[in-house]
Amino acid sequence: MPIGVPKVPFRSPGEEDASWVDIYNRLYRERLLFLGQEVDSEISNQLIGLMIYLSIEDDTKDLYLFINSPGGWVIPGVALYDTMQFVQPDVHTICMGSAASMGSFILVGGEITKRLAFPHARVMIHQPAGSFSEVATGEFILEVGELLKLRETLTRVYVQRTGKPLWVVSEDMERDVFMSATEAQAYGIVDLVAVE
């Protein structure tokens, strides 16, 4: 029997009785956000909306984005990254489990000095991929051009936020590069590794 999304009691200020809300809504009220799936337009838009709402509600309290993601679509991921840079509160990024592909890009986008990985977390970077099956030659050429632009954008962000030279990041993005939490810290993707 699946348990679904757990519900927890929550009492709004000024109310006598607590109401039961799903755990994620309760945690959102504490400014704790979760990316626990592949990045797509739906989850990206939900997180963007939450970040903007919470920023408007109080732009002095930091946001905390917990990441356990296998990656996903580039454009929704870049939109989420851009929002993290746009909102006034600092966005802490915390990798638990894995932050692969677009997940690692969002992880590196946290406020510098406020990016953390749990001790057994895994991080993976690589170049963006396209879907070339059943594409006409003209469309293929356009898609390759767009992919090259996206790759350059992602590479420059990694360079800026990790402090690694362009040639190192470019070379590493040629293939899947997996890292432990301490290796991700040495690379500059995270600033701290949580202690066990």
Swiss-Prot record:
InterPro entries hit by this protein: ClpP, ClpP/crotonase-like_dom_sf, ClpP/TepA, ClpP_His_AS, ClpP_Ser_AS
Active site residues according to the UniProt entry: 101, 126
Name assigned to this protein: ATP-dependent Clp protease proteolytic subunit
Keyword Transmembrane recorded: no
Keywords: Chloroplast, Hydrolase, Plastid, Protease, Serine protease
Compartments, record wording: Plastid, Chloroplast stroma
GO molecular function: ATP-dependent peptidase activity; serine-type endopeptidase activity
Main location: plastid
EC nos: 3.4.21.92
Homology family: Belongs to the peptidase S14 family.
GO biological process, any: proteolysis
GO cellular component, one term: chloroplast stroma
